[in-house]
Amino acid sequence: MSDQLFERTMAFAGILQAVAQVQYIARHGDSDKDALAASLQSVLVTNPETTSDVYADKVALRKGYELIVSQLGDAKQKDVEVTRYLVGILALERKLTRSSNAMGMLSERINQIHRQLSHFEITDEQVIANFAGIYSDIISELGPKLQISGNPEFLKRTQTQQKIRALLLSAMRSAVLWRQLGGKRRHLVFARKTIVDTAMKSLTL
């Protein structure tokens, strides 16, 4: 497989890995701290030399690759909720990258989090709140808000809402990277087998 295809599939796995966590938190009210940290860390790597630099935690990406196989492969049971979130993220990504003003604000706010990390861990509540604030202030303003399904008891909690928004920001970061690497929505229809094969090979590396 070509390096670009490998890297593009890695970025797509990054989207789905974040989406999977959104779904889990919305249903169960909690998250895997390492997986959460890996997704949030990807937002902060804005000038990578390679795509692998964005996704340092390869273990955390496994869920993303597995979702590629199940969502785009031959499995009869597709997760329509994951598909809905993915479609929403890709639509918002197009609006984001077409807005130089939004991209500029995004860069500035991410730099603020970089400075904050000299005092806090990336999964501390204050940092997650800032990631969530970026999503609310910049991304949510670009188009229709994503409707998150889950347990109402968990969804009304501020901490749950902030983790979900922070993870949606991570999904957006991966969507931007996927597009920069040549990803197009038509590939998800006409190049599904190639993407699935690449994901399956990536799972064995």
Curated annotation (Swiss-Prot):
Provide the Gene Ontology terms for cellular component: cytoplasm; plasma membrane
Instruction: List S-S links within the chain.
Output: none
Predominant location: cytoplasm
Q: Does the keyword Zinc apply?
A: no
> Which subcellular locations apply to this protein?
Cytoplasm; Cell inner membrane
Which keywords fit this entry according to its UniProt record?
Answer: Cell inner membrane, Cell membrane, Cytoplasm, Membrane
**UniProt keyword Cell inner membrane, yes or no:** yes
Report membrane topology. Answer: Peripheral membrane protein
Family, according to the entry, reads as follows:
Belongs to the HflD family.
Q: What is the protein name given in its UniProt record?
A: High frequency lysogenization protein HflD homolog
